């Protein structure tokens, strides 16, 4: 079953005939699919984290048997921009500033300010019907950089008002009240009406430079708010993900997608095991002369054995900047390829113009290798791990 971008998946299916779809090298069969809302398009904005976060919470509502709701990504983005500016100014410009964010930003913002449906706040106040934040990001960055130069030798109380005025001009003013399906709400009362307990969600990661079974702030630029993730051994890190999907909970996933094995248009992400040392002398000579584009093309021409991912391999990639915090997405199911290799099915926020209508398949090695962190419902975590983490 391959969901199209115009309708929610309202049932789980496991039909190997209906679910099979071919690419040049790979044939995927969905094993388990969870309920999702339609694929959206972040367009030219660095707001994947908000799109993935709202998709995750929308699926949580569907899992609970509640009606489909389209939550506003830009309401969250607006408040994150404000909080990010405050932190940037207080830190004298020594933290990251831009459109990016982390998984935990979505939960933190909604806890503080509530949420609104998409129809109440689209964030498109600049003459376009798609999100295009190049100018907005540049203007906001120039503004906060001007503030921290402190030309008056004392910051005025007006800088924040001016900053918010920019957001009002580009995204629109925040609604104090709005009407949705015949009822009037504020952002906080609308959130209350959804019945979500945001304390149910925790972030998980796996790195060796901090103690296991303890929370720490993952050191990536977009974790500007210093959100905490529980650090798990790789085996448990993987077990939580598998258990989550098996128990019917989707996953809010932050990953590196800069790998050449990430082939979104073709609909899959893998970690080819292209070790030069495993090649013959003639193969080594030929391979080392190939450009990166030629290597990528050759990798696509045949199904390749994937790299064995260990805790050490994962850590090394993070330590040397081969793994970076690129993208937020939603893991919505599991699948296998024609050789029985296991994959996670992923909902993206780049529209529906790829092989699988906005979805793709990420191999287990890719997920273990390239995941920065992920958010899950704590009830999806195996009981023994819940006990170790003292989750209640």
What does each model-found stretch correspond to?
Residues 1-12:
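Bacterial Sec-dependent N-terminal signal peptides
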Residues 2-4, 63, 69, 130-131, ...:
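Alpha-helix boundary/interfacial micro-motifs
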Residues 4-5, 44, 106, 327:
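Generic detector of short, well-ordered, non-transmembrane alpha-helical segments enriched
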Residues 13-25:
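Blade/loop signatures of beta-propeller domains
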Residues 23-252, 354-356:
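Active-site nucleophile-adjacent alpha helix/oxyanion-hole segment immediately C-terminal to the catalytic cysteine
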Residues 161-392:
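Active-site signature of cysteine proteases
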């Amino acid at each position: 079953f391959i969901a199209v971008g115009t309708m929610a998946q309202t049932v789980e299916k496991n039909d190997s005939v209906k679910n099979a779809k071919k690419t040049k090298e790979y044939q995927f069969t969905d094993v388990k699919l969870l309920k999702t809302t339609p694929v959206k398009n972040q367009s030219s904005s660095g707001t994947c984290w908000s799109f993935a976060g709202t998709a995750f919470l929308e699926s949580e509502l569907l899992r609970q048997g509640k009606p489909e709701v389209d939550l506003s990504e830009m309401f969250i983005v607006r408040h994150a921009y404000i909080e990010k500016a405050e932190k940037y100014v207080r830190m004298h410009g020594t933290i990251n500033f831009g459109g990016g964010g982390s998984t935990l930003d979505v939960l933190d913002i909604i806890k503080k300010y509530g949420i609104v449906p998409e129809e109440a706040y689209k964030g498109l106040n600049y003459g376009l019907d798609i999100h295009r934040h190049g100018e907005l990001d540049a203007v906001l960055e120039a503004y906060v950089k001007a503030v921290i130069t402190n030309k008056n030798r004392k910051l005025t109380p007006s800088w924040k008002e001016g900053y918010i005025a920019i957001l009002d001009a580009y995204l629109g003013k925040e609604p104090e009240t709005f009407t949705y399906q015949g009822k009037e709400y504020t952002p906080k009362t609308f959130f209350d009406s959804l019945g979500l307990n945001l304390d149910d969600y925790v972030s998980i990661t796996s790195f060796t430079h901090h103690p296991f079974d303890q929370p720490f702030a993952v050191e990536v630029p977009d974790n500007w708010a210093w959100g905490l993730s529980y650090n798990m051994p790789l085996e448990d890190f993987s077990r939580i993900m598998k258990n989550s999907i098996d128990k019917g909970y989707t996953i809010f996933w932050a990953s590196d997608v800069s790998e050449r094995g990430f082939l979104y248009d073709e609909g899959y992400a893998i970690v080819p095991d292209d070790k030069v040392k495993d090649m013959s002398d003639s193969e080594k000579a030929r391979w080392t002369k190939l450009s990166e584009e030629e290597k990528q093309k050759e990798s696509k021409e045949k199904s390749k054995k994937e790299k064995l991912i260990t805790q050490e391999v994962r850590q090394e990639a993070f330590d040397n900047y081969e793994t970076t915090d690129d993208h937020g997405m939603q893991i919505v199911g599991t699948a296998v390829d024609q050789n029985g290799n296991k994959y996670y099915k992923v909902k993206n926020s780049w529209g529906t113009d790829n092989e699988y209508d906005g979805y793709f398949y990420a191999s287990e090695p890719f997920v273990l290798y390239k995941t920065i962190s992920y958010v899950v419902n704590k009830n999806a975590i195996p009981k023994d791990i819940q006990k170790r983490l003292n989750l209640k």
